[in-house]
């Protein structure tokens, strides 16, 4: 009987704390409503800059040392078959005055 009471107390405490985390506890409903409209406006606002999904190209700004202009060049691979063409790896190197430098 004692263990049953302890279990009931624990479960009520556990679920009570779970609900307290997810339910808003505002004493003024109008303040909660204003906050929600502000949050919705922020979600609907378009970003100032466009973000592209995926990884970025390597940066060659410091790869060539004092040589300039240091620019990024894509190294091409010849794939063995047409089926492998979609998964053919892409590699980059930094070039300055016909000399190649490794990408940092």
From Swiss-Prot:
UniProt cross-references to Pfam families, sorted A to Z: EPF
Tissues and organs where the protein is expressed, per its UniProt entry: Expressed in shoots, but not in roots. Mostly localized in developing leaves, specifically in meristemoids, guard mother cells (GMCs), and young guard cells.
Signal peptide start and end residues: 1-20
GO cellular component, one term: extracellular region
Predominant location category: secreted
Disruption phenotype: Increased stomatal density and violation of the one-cell-spacing rule (clustering of stomata).
The entry's keywords: Developmental protein, Disulfide bond, Glycoprotein, Secreted, Signal
Induction, per UniProt: Not induced by high CO(2).
Protein name listed in UniProt: Protein EPIDERMAL PATTERNING FACTOR 1
Organism encoding this protein: Arabidopsis thaliana (Mouse-ear cress)
Lineage: Eukaryota, Viridiplantae, Streptophyta, Embryophyta, Tracheophyta
């Amino acid at each position: 009987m004692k263990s049953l009471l302890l279990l009931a107390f624990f479960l009520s405490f556990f679920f009570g704390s779970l609900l307290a985390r997810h339910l808003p506890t505002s004493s003024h409903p109008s303040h909660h409503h204003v906050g929600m409209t502000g949050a919705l406006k922020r979600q609907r606002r378009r970003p100032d800059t466009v973000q592209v999904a995926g990884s970025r190209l390597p940066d060659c700004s410091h790869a060539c040392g004092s040589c300039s202009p240091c620019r990024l060049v894509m190294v091409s691979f010849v794939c063995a078959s047409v089926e492998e063409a979609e998964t053919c790896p892409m590699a980059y190197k930094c070039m300055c005055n016909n000399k190649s430098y490794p990408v940092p």
